[in-house]
């Protein structure tokens, strides 16, 4: 038996919120209802993307209109319904414009021109950071820490947020302060999968803030599109090397800051399938060369920086890839003159850029004098005056090429500043080489101030004149 004392259920009318209109009832709205609202003739109609408004002077209020006529234009360019022409003939002139049905309003919205999202996305892609923001986002070292996009763009709407998100995470500017937040965003939030937006991951500024597990998880989350990775000074052990295997699109790998011991065999086991890898930098502190006979070099390697504890046996017995065009030596305490020339005898003719950095304690004061003999196609060369002498630019070491002119364009002369180095290379040594056409393509000479040259002397003036004859210049490199 039913409980008659129970109150009857009453269903509340369902209302939905429509952008630009507010709440509208949808129950029993099977047909669009037509209704008219009269506007005084002297009222000024204001049209916005959210709707139309006019000011009611009698009630001192602003009235919102959402259903404007869409078929005829009035005197001010607004449209008026022909269906109400009979009534508007008597009332239109008197009471003003007539507001039409829901269908007319929807038609008016559909015919409005809207900028496609694809074009907006392309515009956002080319937008630059304002100069004021770039200046504010510079650190004490002068490096930019900007994210590459104005953060206010993400607050415009949901579509703009989705379009700006890839640019925001493309190359995140990480520091010790925001690193933990970045790790939480990439690792913990798996639903958004923000890792596939990261293309460049620079952890060189992270000092004592990460752990091996953090770096390993970051590499796994960002492996799909990661093309550039700079390892941190610490927290790069065995686990990150294992995770590095999944970054198949990697093009730039810099391990120069790693202070932990890296086994050469494990490193090449991780990168052997990197067909797109072009830049590789060895760890600067220590590296274990055991098992180097079985290593397999990336097939498209262009740039190689040797540093750390590489041995003479490794340099002499390794079959170096002929694709290398840029080679750097940086703090190799065990490398001798014999090892360097053994390497240059294999790939010296293919090298376009060759750089030597201080210190190289196993080299003598004239160990680099024969560089031009092994590398005839260099475009840029950096020499440490500590390990070369004036005979490096003599006619015996630097002779003319028979088939073509020597293509060297830029020469860097660096110096550690030790005593007795100011007299090793004199400006006249370079002047004579230029005047004898042994360096016909030389355009730039960058000299370290530690070399001790007097820039106001006649010898330096002669060198400048000889360079100007070749449209070149002399620079003091601080």
Curated annotation (Swiss-Prot):
One of the record's GO molecular function terms: protein-macromolecule adaptor activity
Region Disordered, annotated ranges: 1-32, 67-101
Biological process, per Gene Ontology: protein ubiquitination; SCF-dependent proteasomal ubiquitin-dependent protein catabolic process
This protein's record includes keyword Ligase: no
Keyword Nucleus in record: no
PTM notes: Autoubiquitinated by the E3 ubiquitin ligase complex in conjunction with the E2 enzyme CDC34.
Amino acid composition bias (Basic and acidic residues), ranges on this chain: 91-101
Low complexity bias (residue ranges): 80-90
InterPro entries: LRR_dom_sf
Pathways per UniProt: Protein modification; protein ubiquitination
Keywords: Ubl conjugation, Ubl conjugation pathway
Annotated F-box domain residues: 112-173
Compositional bias ranges of the Basic residues kind: 1-14
Cellular component annotations (GO), alphabetically ordered: SCF ubiquitin ligase complex
Notes concerning its domains: The F-box domain contains an unusual insert of 18 residues (131-148).
Cited function: Substrate recognition component of a SCF (SKP1-CUL1-F-box protein) E3 ubiquitin-protein ligase complex which mediates the ubiquitination and subsequent proteasomal degradation of target proteins. Probably recognizes and binds to phosphorylated target proteins.
Quaternary organization: Interacts with SKP1. Component of the probable SCF(YDR306C) complex containing CDC53, SKP1, RBX1 and YDR306C.
UniProt-recorded name of the protein: F-box protein YDR306C
Organism listed in the record: Saccharomyces cerevisiae (strain ATCC 204508 / S288c)
Lineage: Eukaryota, Fungi, Dikarya, Ascomycota, Saccharomycotina
């Amino acid at each position: 038996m039913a409980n008659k004392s129970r109150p009857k259920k009453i269903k509340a009318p369902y209302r939905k919120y429509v952008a630009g209109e507010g709440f509208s009832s949808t129950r029993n709205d099977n047909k669009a209802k037509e209704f008219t609202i009269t506007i005084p003739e002297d009222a000024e109609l204001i049209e916005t993307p959210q709707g139309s408004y006019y000011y009611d002077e009698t009630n001192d209020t602003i009235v919102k209109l959402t259903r404007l006529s869409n078929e005829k234009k009035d005197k001010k360019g607004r449209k008026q319904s022909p269906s109400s022409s009979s009534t508007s003939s008597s009332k239109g002139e008197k009471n003003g414009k007539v507001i039409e049905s829901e269908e007319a309003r929807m038609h008016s919205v559909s015919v409005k021109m809207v900028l496609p999202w694809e074009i907006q996305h392309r515009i956002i892609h080319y937008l630059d950071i304002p100069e004021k923001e770039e200046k504010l986002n510079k650190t004490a070292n002068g490096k930019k820490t900007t994210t590459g996009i104005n953060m206010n763009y993400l607050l415009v709407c949901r579509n703009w947020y989705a379009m700006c998100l890839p640019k925001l995470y493309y190359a995140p500017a990480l520091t010790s302060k925001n690193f933990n937040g970045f790790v939480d965003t990439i690792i913990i939030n798996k639903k958004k999968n923000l890792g596939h937006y990261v293309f460049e991951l620079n952890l060189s500024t992270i000092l004592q803030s990460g752990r091996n597990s953090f770096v390993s998880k970051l590499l796994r989350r960002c492996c799909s599109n990661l093309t550039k990775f700079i390892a941190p000074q610490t927290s790069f052990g065995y686990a990150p090397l294992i995770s590095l295997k999944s970054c198949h699109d990697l093009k730039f790998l810099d391990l120069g800051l790693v202070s932990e011991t890296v086994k050469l065999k494990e490193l090449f086991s991780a990168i052997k399938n990197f067909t797109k890898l072009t830049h590789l930098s060895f760890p600067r502190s220590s590296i274990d060369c055991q098992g180097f006979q079985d290593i397999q070099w990336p097939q498209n390697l262009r740039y190689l920086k040797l540093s750390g504890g590489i041995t003479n046996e490794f340099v002499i017995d390794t079959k170096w890839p002929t694709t290398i065009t840029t080679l750097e030596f940086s703090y190799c305490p065990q490398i001798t003159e014999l090892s360097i020339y053994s390497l240059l005898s294999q790939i010296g003719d293919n090298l376009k850029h060759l750089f030597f950095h201080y210190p190289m304690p196993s080299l003598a004061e004239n160990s680099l004098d024969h560089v031009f003999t092994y590398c005839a196609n260099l475009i840029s060369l950096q020499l440490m005056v500590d390990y070369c002498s004036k005979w490096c630019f003599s006619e015996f070491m630097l002779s003319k090429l028979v088939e073509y002119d020597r293509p060297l364009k830029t020469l860097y002369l660096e110096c550690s500043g030790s005593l007795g180095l100011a007299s090793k290379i004199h400006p006249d040594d370079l002047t004579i080489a230029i005047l004898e056409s042994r360096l016909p393509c030389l355009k730039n000479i960058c000299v370290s101030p530690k070399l001790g040259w007097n820039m106001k002397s006649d010898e330096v003036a002669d060198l400048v004149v000889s360079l100007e004859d070749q449209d070149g210049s002399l620079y003091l490199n601080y």
